[in-house]
């Protein structure tokens, strides 16, 4: 997969099949669009091209209300490569680019560089200044320029449209298993291990505190989760607490994970991936630390019983 991170060095292709979108989450709806692009391009022996934007446009256009995002760009590229896209263009999105009109974007980037025989987009995608580039706009433009436009219908499950907005809502409410189903991959994110207060070690459950690499990363609702971690290429299961540790009357939000089979306690500064498999319970204020320890032992047993399902 070829990846271009500037519009100044993207190639000129004789013909291609193109899709355009933000693709935050690369969820099952996005994947249907991408699979259609790949299969169509392969059927005519041309390259498949995906044009996307980084950072998320709403991070530039809505500075006072930054949208929590579902994935770091590295995760997006990992999924796109697994779907066999040939060319990915990551257009740097800034205020100047946000003022480019839809027609100018199509003329100067899409048509000029990729000469599309077909453009395939999702039903709700808009692009260009003031979101002028609607599916209807693109269809009419395609008729002018002599290429076809396919607008794919939404993917639904149990009468619910799979969308980034709905998936964000699920994660914010702690429904991580359902969110992963709609994403088509297990929700999680790359993080850096930071030094904590050592509270978990005192309780007999040493933990690694972590913060997401992506500063605008969406995190699940407070609570205890069964997780799978990846450290230096190794998969480890564990349990994770997101919250404020109310038993100790603390107020700062902390993310900490206890790995069941971690052989080294010295992972400070390491990058790890934490995948949220299932939510176990709410965060609870216990009357004393001993009550918390008793509950943590029950939580661990609960998580261990779930491991076989994910092996």
Model feature map: region roles:
Residues 59-123, 127-145:
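N-terminal Rossmann-like or analogous alpha/beta NTP/dinucleotide-binding catalytic cores
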Residues 7-72:
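N-terminal catalytic cores of NTP/NDP-binding nucleotidyl/phosphoryl-transfer enzymes
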Residues 9-12, 95-98, 156-160:
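A short acidic, often aromatic-flanked loop/helix-cap motif at beta-alpha or helix-coil junctions
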Residues 27, 80, 119, 179, ...:
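Residue-level signal for inorganic ion chemistry
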């Amino acid at each position: 997969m070829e990846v271009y991170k500037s519009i100044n060095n993207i190639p000129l292709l004789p013909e291609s099949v193109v899709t355009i979108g933000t693709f935050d989450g690369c969820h099952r709806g996005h994947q249907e669009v991408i699979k259609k692009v790949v299969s169509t391009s392969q059927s005519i022996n041309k390259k498949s091209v995906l044009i996307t934007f980084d950072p998320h446009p709403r991070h530039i256009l809505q500075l006072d209300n930054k949208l929590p995002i579902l994935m770091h760009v590295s995760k997006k590229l990992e999924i796109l490569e697994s779907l066999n896209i040939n060319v990915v263009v990551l257009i740097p999105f800034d205020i100047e680019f946000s003022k480019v009109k839809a027609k100018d974007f199509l003329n100067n980037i899409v048509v000029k560089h990729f000469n599309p025989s077909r453009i395939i987009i999702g039903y709700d995608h808009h692009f260009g200044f003031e979101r002028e580039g609607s599916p209807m706009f693109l269809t009419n433009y395609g008729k002018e320029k002599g290429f076809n436009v396919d607008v794919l219908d939404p993917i639904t499950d149990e009468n619910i449209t799979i969308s980034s907005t709905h998936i964000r809502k699920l994660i914010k409410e702690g429904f991580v298993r359902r969110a992963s189903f709609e994403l088509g991959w297990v929700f999680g994110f790359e993080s850096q291990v930071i030094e904590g207060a050592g509270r978990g070690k005192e309780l007999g459950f040493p933990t690694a505190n972590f913060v997401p690499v992506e500063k605008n990363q969406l995190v699940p609702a407070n609570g205890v989760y069964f997780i799978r971690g990846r450290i230096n290429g190794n998969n480890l299961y564990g349990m994770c607490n997101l919250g404020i540790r109310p038993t100790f009357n603390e107020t700062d939000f902390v993310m900490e994970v206890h790995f069941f089979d971690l052989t080294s306690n010295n992972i400070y500064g390491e990058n790890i991936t934490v995948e949220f498999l299932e939510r176990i319970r709410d965060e609870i204020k216990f009357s004393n630390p001993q009550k918390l320890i008793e509950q943590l032992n029950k939580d661990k047993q609960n998580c261990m019983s779930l491991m076989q399902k994910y092996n």
